[in-house]
């Protein structure tokens, strides 16, 4: 290989493949709260397939299980915990502004 072509070749970097979030023995069920809670955001929304790194079939089963758990009130539909609380309230100025004509 001559020098001009060698500049454009990329070095092959080794990478470690991540473990799948659902193993073959895991059962996707509405009662398995430890598994289901991994696929829900802090606001209580179902995370997407790309974020979860699961297959389409697994994502469908997760969605069904989460919806069943919500209906049976095992999971909340929304998680409305206030993350930002006011430390001190600032008083507003009550002076009246008058227009000059």
Curated annotation (Swiss-Prot):
One of its GO terms (biological process) is translation. Keywords: Chloroplast, Plastid, Ribonucleoprotein, Ribosomal protein, RNA-binding, rRNA-binding. GO terms for cellular component: chloroplast; mitochondrial small ribosomal subunit. Gene3D superfamilies: Ribosomal protein S18 (4.10.640.10). The keyword Ribosomal protein applies. SUPFAM superfamilies: Ribosomal protein S18 (SSF46911). PROSITE patterns: RIBOSOMAL_S18. Pfam families: Ribosomal_S18. InterPro entries: Ribosomal_bS18 (IPR001648), Ribosomal_bS18_CS (IPR018275), Ribosomal_bS18_sf (IPR036870). The keyword Ribonucleoprotein applies. One of its GO terms (molecular function) is small ribosomal subunit rRNA binding. It is found in: Plastid, Chloroplast. Part of the 30S ribosomal subunit. NCBIfam families: S18 (TIGR00165). Belongs to the bacterial ribosomal protein bS18 family. This is Small ribosomal subunit protein bS18c.
């Amino acid at each position: 290989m001559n020098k001009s072509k060698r500049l454009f070749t990329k070095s092959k970097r080794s990478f470690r493949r991540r473990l799948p979030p659902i193993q073959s023995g895991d059962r996707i069920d509405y009662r398995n709260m430890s598994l289901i809670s991994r696929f829900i955001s802090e606001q209580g929304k179902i995370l997407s397939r790309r974020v979860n790194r699961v297959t389409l079939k697994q994502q469908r089963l997760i969605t069904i299980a989460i919806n069943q758990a919500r209906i049976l009130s095992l999971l909340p539909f929304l998680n409305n915990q206030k993350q930002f609380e006011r430390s001190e309230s600032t008083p507003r100025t009550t002076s009246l502004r008058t227009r000059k004509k």
